[in-house]
Amino acid sequence: MNMAIHKNQNGPDGKLFEGLIKRLAGSLHLYKQYFMIQLKSTMQYKTSFFLTALGQFLASFNVFLGMYFMFQRFRNVRAYGYGEVLLCCGILLMEFSLAETFARGFDQFSSIIGNGTFDRIMVRPRSSVLQVLGQRIEFTRLGRMVQAVIIFAYSLSVGTVDWSFSRIVVLIFMLLGGTALFAGIFLIYAAICFFTLEGLEFMNVLTDGAREYGKYPFDIYGKKILLFATFVVPYACVQYYPLLFVLGRGKWWYGLLPGAGVVFLLPCYLLWRVGVRHYKSTGS
């Protein structure tokens, strides 16, 4: 029996699984190297880093002030109180900040194509996606992340959410799903650059625009916007629906919808693969 088990482990399926594990471990190790290189490069100019991060923090702080003064005059927005809107805002800003920190390479992809860097990426025996991710890690966006954490923490003190284990888990799913969603949008932006060479400004509506109007629950904008944010670009699946679950107003399966943000990566990656196949070298 032991011989049979040993034989099964060395069969085609076992070797395939072992190969996948080794490949994943190799990719993680490579990304770790990229991460450390980018961190060391950033820390060469500590003053610039801290001032830029502080600027990111202060530039985003007007969001909190705007909400504070608005709720001083109006007690509710639709059916949402001050603490509930702050919770929504804090979560979305954390999602966007994480995506912008670690997926910044895709947002700068037009320059990667223009200066011929992608030619070098193509001839290396590693994932092109992983290499582009490692081209730029924007640590200065941590200033915005700190502000988002402060808003989130403050929302806990003024809100009325009855936190439970399931709601904490859904909150974590929201962060993961939202980060994946925004990373997917950056990936779409990069894929379009294969055909246009330059990035298209309208994509900012899906990134920076979503960051702005996603600070409030999507249902306040009307049914059409909610439908778009559910079935086209699933912002609502990582914000509105799971937020209802956390607030105790939604169905249990709303807590599963942040997974749509991860699933959204699949069509984004397929579009990327189409772009890679159509890529023509700059010749530089």
Task: List where the protein language model places each region.
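Hydrophobic transmembrane alpha-helices and immediately adjacent juxtamembrane helices
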Residues: 2-284
